[in-house]
């Protein structure tokens, strides 16, 4: 019913430097979400974003003072109704590229309050491994701080580059999540 009233602007921030399982996951999600939503993709691995220096100047200037892709990227994120984060597991955490984008959101963090969000994580260990829990907890903390409505957190096990393409159950689940 919500879709009949208003199209949602969904922002998918996905890091898939290898163009493998995370890309497959977000493609399945998008397939479900495409009807009735405007979807944009942010690909951190293709952006030039310097690490946050913690200088605090952004609080005076209402944006990052770095002359890179930060402010344009954060503008996109702030304008979204829903943000979907998708990442491979790197050393028990999200990818450095995604973390860097999230860190740079500090410059406009309060404008992210109340967003609908979702999380898709793909790793090379079974989904009961601690690595997924650590990432979920980090996103839970962000969601709590920013009053996010965390709609879903999904983890998938895929070791070889195209493993997720063979997992029809996971692809169907992601498509169904996207269509909600």
Model-derived regions: residue spans:
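Glycine-rich phosphate/pyrophosphate-binding loop and the adjoining helix
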Residues: 33, 140-180
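Single conserved hydrophobic/aromatic residue that forms the stacking wall/gate
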Residues: 1-13
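Cysteine-cluster motifs in flexible loop/terminal segments that predominantly coordinate metals
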Residues: 47-77
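Helix-loop-strand module that forms the ligand-binding subsite of alpha/beta enzymes
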Residues: 65-146
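A short beta-strand-loop structural module common to alpha/beta enzyme folds
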Residues: 37-48
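Cofactor-binding loop segments of dinucleotide-utilizing enzymes, especially the Rossmann-like FAD-
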Residues: 13-15, 44, 121-124
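A short, Lys/Arg-enriched amphipathic alpha-helix followed by its capping loop at the start of a domain
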Residues: 28-37
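Short, surface-exposed alpha-helical segments at coil->helix boundaries
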Residues: 23-27, 132-140, 171
């Amino acid at each position: 019913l919500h879709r009949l009233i208003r199209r949602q602007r969904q922002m998918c921030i996905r890091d898939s430097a290898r163009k493998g399982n995370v890309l497959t996951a977000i493609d399945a999600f998008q397939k479900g979400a495409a009807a009735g939503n405007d979807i944009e993709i942010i690909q951190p691995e293709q952006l030039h974003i310097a690490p946050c220096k913690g200088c605090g100047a952004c609080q005076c200037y209402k944006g990052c003072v770095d002359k890179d892709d930060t402010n344009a990227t954060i503008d996109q994120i702030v304008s979204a109704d829903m943000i979907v984060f998708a990442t491979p597991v790197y050393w028990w955490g999200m990818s450095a590229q995604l973390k860097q984008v999230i860190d740079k959101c500090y410059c406009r963090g309060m404008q992210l309050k109340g967003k609908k969000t979702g999380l898709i994580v793909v790793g090379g260990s079974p989904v009961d491994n601690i690595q997924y829990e650590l990432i979920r907890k980090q996103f839970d903390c962000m969601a709590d701080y920013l009053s996010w409505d965390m709609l879903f957190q999904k983890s998938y096990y895929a070791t070889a580059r195209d493993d997720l393409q063979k997992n029809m159950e996971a692809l169907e689940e992601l498509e169904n999540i996207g269509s909600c």
